[in-house]
Swiss-Prot record:
Domain of life: Bacteria
Gene: prfA
Protein name: Peptide chain release factor 1
Subcellular location: Cytoplasm
Family per record: Belongs to the prokaryotic/mitochondrial release factor family.
PANTHER family, A to Z: LD18447P
Keywords carried by this UniProt record: Cytoplasm, Methylation, Protein biosynthesis
InterPro entries: PCRF, Pep_chain_release_fac_I, Pep_chain_release_fac_I_sf, Prokaryotic/Mito_RF, RF-1
Keyword Protein biosynthesis found: yes
Length: 358
């Protein structure tokens, strides 16, 4: 291990001890914001320090085994211990490198998840509903809260477009690689000849913006229109101009909401979505530049890129960015996304580690 990395890890161990002491203080909960920050820092530092402790213990075990090499009776045992210890040390070193990789500041944020039906008409809209169910079930597995912000339903019960807010720890970190084109191959319910059709949807995952720190919206740059809501909401909504559309004039970005029970609620939701869209554009520009610099296959956030194919006749799902194919489509569509998300996160970590080595 490099001396600079060992010194950094020793500093983190000292900091964990300090944070633990602060959290145990009688005055710790007097400032709840500071208490929450310390709790988060403690949770982030603990796995790093524990792994570093295991690394140092392993180094000590190897040194003890090397001392036994001079004893003829213990030599064979010592050699086996050293070989096993070095393998373990290498694995711990790699784990520490991953733990020390720069954290995405958005990883712990809530997200807005937007699904738009693309080519394929009614079948694409039905697939959009299937994707929404998949992400909703995944959110439930993670005990995240799901809120529908805006929905435009199709005639057959699908969605032309739907936006949901997912609230929960690590929502962005787990789903940020879902942005892009999702293609489905299956026999539609409306198909009488049994032919397989190909349809597509576009998914956009946007981190919820911190309105104060990350996106400043000048009221002079906004055009706010109200109109009659359609669809869900009942007669009351249809009789009043409760739906809200907000346009950010400098960029032309639009956000609208009509699913709330009042114009005030819809305006607040539309402002949140607008801020998230503007923040998302800023992030994508930054990510695309960084991805191009390290020739990244994932994480660029290119919405036009086809990232995944769902083949129903074969029960197959393929992620084209990492050439991963799973024959467990039913499980994935029921929200079992862990294998996919874990593989994508691992690929990004490998890319970042390779970049550090350059």
């Amino acid at each position: 291990m490099k001396a600079s990395i060992a010194a950094r890890l020793a500093q983190l161990a000292d900091r964990l001890e300090e944070v633990t002491h602060l959290l145990a203080s009688e005055t710790a909960t007097q400032d709840m914001e500071a208490f929450k920050k310390l709790t988060r820092e403690h949770a982030e530092l603990t796995p790093v320090v524990e792994t570093f402790s295991a690394y140092r213990q392993c180094e000590g075990d190897i040194a003890a085994a090397e001392d036994m090499l001079a004893d003829p009776e213990m030599k064979e045992f010592a050699q086996a211990e050293i070989a096993e210890g070095k393998d373990k040390l290498e694995a711990l070193d790699l784990e520490l490198q991953k733990l020390l990789l720069p954290k995405d500041p958005n990883d712990d944020k809530n997200i807005f998840l937007e699904i738009r039906a693309g080519t394929g008409g009614d079948e694409a809209a039905l697939f959009a509903a299937d994707l929404l169910r998949m992400y909703t079930r995944y959110a439930e597995r993670n005990r995240w809260q799901v809120e529908i912000v805006s929905a435009s339903e199709s005639d057959l019960g699908g969605y032309k477009e739907v936006i949901v807010r997912l609230v929960g720890q690590g929502a962005y970190s787990r789903l940020k690689f879902e942005s892009g084109g999702h293609r489905v191959q299956r026999v539609p319910a409306t198909e009488t000849q049994g032919r397989i059709h190909t349809s597509a949807c576009t998914v956009a995952v946007m981190a919820e913006a911190d309105e104060i720190a990350e996106v400043v919206l000048n009221p002079a740059d906004l055009r706010i229109d109200t109109f009659r809501a359609s669809g869900a909401g009942g007669q009351h909504i249809n009789k009043t101009d409760s739906a809200v559309r907000i346009t950010h004039i400098p960029t032309g970005i639009v956000a609208e909401c009509q699913d709330g029970r009042s114009q005030h609620a819809n305006k607040a939701s539309a402002m949140q979505v607008l801020a998230a869209r503007i923040y998302d554009i800023q992030l994508r520009e930054k990510n695309q530049k960084e991805a191009a610099e390290r020739k990244s296959l994932i994480g660029s956030g290119d919405r036009s890129e086809r990232i995944r194919t769902y083949n129903y006749p074969q029960g197959r799902i393929t992620d084209h960015r990492i050439n991963l194919t799973l024959y467990k489509l039913d499980y994935v569509m029921d929200g079992d996304l862990a294998e996919l998300t874990d593989a994508l996160i691992a690929e990004q970590q490998a890319e970042l580690l390779a970049a550090l080595g350059d």
